[in-house]
UniProtKB/Swiss-Prot annotation:
Consequences of knocking out this gene: Gas vesicle formation is wild-type (strain NRC-1), expressed in situ. No gas vesicle formation, strongly decreased accumulation of gvpACN transcripts (strain PHH1), expressed in H.volcanii.
Other remarks in the entry: Encoded in a 14-gene plasmid locus called p-vac which produces predominantly short, spindle-shaped gas vesicles during all stages of growth.
Oligomer and partners: Forms homodimers, forms a GvpN1-GvpO1 heterodimer, interacts with GvpC1 (via the latter's C-terminus), GvpF1, GvpI1 and GvpL1, might interact with GvpA1.
Residue ranges with Basic and acidic residues bias: 1-12
The name this protein goes by in its record: Gas vesicle protein O1
Subcellular location field: Gas vesicle; Cytoplasm
InterPro entries the record matches: Gas-vesicle_GvpO
Region (Disordered): 1-48
Alphabetical UniProt keywords: Cytoplasm, Gas vesicle, Plasmid
Source domain of life: Archaea
Length: 119
């Protein structure tokens, strides 16, 4: 009678790789589902439009951290003529590792024509 612990012929012939166990919860590893910079930019843009209800102007910063992503976006809070008098709001939007919004905060407001130091 063959010792199952020492009989590897069935596993080797079947082509199955039993060397690497599957994830304990059956889901792919986090690295396989990592939330990329491109995903973070898209999600922050959507969040800015949905949560702030203003016209998205642009993203000026996106950086990853241990919890997910920190982004800084600008939205047009008030249109004016001339457009140099538009009021721009600069917001920080934080996302977790799956892209869910965990918070947002107004950093500052300024007129488009004012010179601003970039973050």
């Amino acid at each position: 009678m063959a010792d199952p612990a020492n009989d590897r012929s069935e596993r080797e012939e079947g082509g199955e790789d039993d060397e690497t166990p599957p994830a304990s919860d059956g889901n792919p590893s986090p690295s396989a589902n990592s939330f990329t910079l491109s995903n973070a930019q898209t999600r922050a843009r959507e969040a800015a439009q949905d949560l702030l209800e203003h016209q998205f102007e642009g993203m000026i910063k996106a950086e990853s951290n241990d919890e997910g992503w920190r982004t800084v976006v600008e939205v047009v809070e008030r249109n004016a003529v001339p457009d140099t008098q538009d009021i721009i709001g600069r917001y920080e939007i934080t996302l977790d590792g799956t892209g869910d919004v965990t918070g947002y905060e107004l950093l500052e407001r300024y007129r488009r024509g004012d010179m601003k130091e970039e973050l």
